[in-house]
């Protein structure tokens, strides 16, 4: 039996010119996740895989340091990267393709974060809908297939594998294991917290393909994050 612990990255720099950089809170979230995983896994042999984005690698570094495993080899797999949110939004609202235009639009809202989430939810629904696949640099079926390929490779790296990735790939994994439709998958996506851990189990005979022979052991674990310290974030 193979156990994959899918870790969503810590909080990135929402609203900044460079989103792909952990905030100070995101680093703290990575450390808390490391403390929790360290207590759970003890001295067990682990393999560690990460997407290639800075927020993935930096979350992995903070987590592994807190586990006392700072020297652990990190395998990088770009197939575990997130979809391009800027492209998804721009295809839905071409008038907001420029980052400055998007910031100006959100600045007029009473709650910019809530306004962005509403806009983003509409954009992702369009992206996943299958009616406009040719519009996107990476359409939903292509994204889903590359993520599933990356997860299948990760599952072949050992019996206990930590995977540092984003909400989109975790959504894909849960959808494949539970057989959710796209609307149900999006509900999972929006519930995922920064630093949340989702655990999948795969029989040794099923590791080469995500789906049959896989099961969901836990979803969006947030022990240590959901408390009075303000560590629980969604974006």
Question: Where in this protein do the model-derived segments appear?
Answer:
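Short beta-strand scaffold positions
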Residues: 50-51, 145, 164-165
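Extended, charge-rich helix/loop segments that form flexible
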Residues: 97-134
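Active-site catalytic microenvironments for nucleophilic, acid-base chemistry
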Residues: 36, 40, 62-66, 153, ...
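Active-site-proximal alpha-helix that buttresses catalytic centers in soluble enzyme cores
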Residues: 2-77, 140-141
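A mid-sequence, solvent-exposed acidic-amphipathic segment
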Residues: 130-161
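Active-site metal-binding loops of divalent metal-dependent hydrolases
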Residues: 10, 167-168, 220-221
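Generic beta-sheet signal
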Residues: 4, 46, 159-165
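Acidic, low-complexity terminal tails and accessory targeting/binding regions
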Residues: 69, 82-111, 141, 157-160, ...
């Amino acid at each position: 039996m193979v156990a994959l612990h899918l870790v969503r990255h810590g909080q990135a720099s929402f609203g900044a010119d460079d989103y792909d950089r952990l905030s100070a809170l995101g680093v703290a979230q990575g450390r808390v996740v490391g403390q929790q995983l360290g207590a759970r896994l003890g001295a067990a042999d682990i393999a560690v895989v990460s997407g290639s984005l800075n927020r993935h690698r930096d979350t992995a570094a903070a987590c592994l340091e807190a586990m006392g495993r700072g020297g652990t080899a990190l395998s990088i797999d770009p197939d575990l990267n997130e979809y391009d949110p800027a492209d998804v939004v721009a295809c839905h609202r071409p008038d907001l393709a420029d980052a400055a235009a998007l910031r100006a639009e959100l600045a007029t809202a009473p709650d910019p974060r809530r306004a962005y989430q509403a806009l983003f939810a509409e954009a992702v629904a369009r992206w996943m809908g299958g009616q406009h696949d040719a519009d996107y640099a990476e359409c939903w079926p292509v994204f889903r297939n590359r993520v599933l390929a990356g997860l299948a490779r990760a599952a072949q790296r050992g019996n206990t594998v930590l995977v540092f990735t984003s909400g989109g790939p975790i959504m894909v994994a849960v959808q494949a294991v539970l057989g959710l439709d796209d609307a149900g998958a999006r509900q999972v996506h929006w519930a995922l917290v920064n630093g949340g851990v989702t655990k999948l189990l795969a029989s040794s005979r099923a590791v080469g393909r995500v789906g049959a022979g896989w099961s969901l052991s836990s979803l969006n674990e947030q022990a240590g994050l959901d408390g009075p310290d303000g560590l629980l974030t969604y974006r």
